[in-house]
Amino acid sequence: MGRPRRRGRDINGVLLLDKPLGLSSNDVLQKVKRLFSANRAGHTGALDPLATGMLPICLGEATKFSQFLLDSDKRYRVVARLGQRTDTSDAEGALISEREVNLTQAQIDTALESFRGESQQIPSMYSALKHQGKPLYEYARQGIEVEREARSITVYELLFIRWEGNDLELEIHCSKGTYIRTIIDDLGELLGCGAHVSYLRRLQVATYPSERMVTLEQLTAMVEAAQAEGRSPNPELDSLLLPMDSAVLNFPEVNLLPSVAAYVKQGQPVHVSGAPSEGMVRITEGKERNFIGIGTIAEDGRVAPKRLVVESVEVENLPVENKK
């Protein structure tokens, strides 16, 4: 007879993890899930093992809103190694060309300017984008080249930080779906010397503050200290979590009276005075402004629930709201 499955906690919130070097995003996710004893967990956009930095991890009901963090802007610090091009466009790949670096600051500045603003980018074959249900990197490892469509991206800011020897350090603020390694590979070809990513750190996702990041070492130390003292680590761990609606704070808020919110919790759209005329909204309830989910503005102006937080208390059946 198998060992009974251990029941996890129904803990909800967003943890800003500082992902370490060398681990995959999924490895880190599973470690955090175990440390928090969480029933459900998901990350919001993978970082390569080579990369470090901000990896928001959604626990419990917060996983329902992780897509909105996937769609948000990101900020990175990257070091490009000039003169060497690799097949993966990073330091883990095989060297495919080596060229002399004979550049001026003016040439670098001119090249960087061409990457600012809106552009079309062809994703790397060593990306997790899927083709016929399989990640592109699996085709690449088999030596198979798959045709990829160019995607619209925006580089809002591209800052020159330093240039020492063959190392060029940049800071990039970009839209969702931007591949930093592709920018560096394209930059190297534009400069005529080739380049690859030797260092990559994600500084920010959406508007989350970097000072709220915690490391796996810090989490592990909290758990071990609590266990050594015979107490639960959960209160200390839970204090690190940001609220669920932190993933959707960019949506305008619609605050409902509890009597109106009851209809929304049953999936019914409601009329709300002063609601936006279109788009997505963040729905809160009562004077405490408790977050209950997100909604959209229907064609008739009503607020229609789209994704709701599950409550432990059942909502009683209510009459259908009069549309008039």
From Swiss-Prot:
Q: Which Gene Ontology BP terms does the record give?
A: mRNA pseudouridine synthesis; tRNA modification; tRNA pseudouridine synthesis
Active-site feature positions: 48 (nucleophile)
Main EC class of this protein? isomerase
Q: Where does substrate bind?
A: 43, 76, 179, 200
Segment forming the signal sequence: none
Q: Where does the sequence pass through the membrane?
A: none
Q: Which UniProt keywords are listed?
A: Isomerase, tRNA processing
Asked if Secreted is a keyword of the record, the answer is: no
* Catalysis: reaction(s): uridine(55) in tRNA = pseudouridine(55) in tRNA
Q: Gene3D superfamilies given for it? A: Pseudouridine synthase, PUA domain
Q: Which domain of life is it from?
A: Bacteria
| Stated role | Responsible for synthesis of pseudouridine from uracil-55 in the psi GC loop of transfer RNAs.
* This protein's name: tRNA pseudouridine synthase B
Q: State the organism named in the record.
A: Yersinia pestis
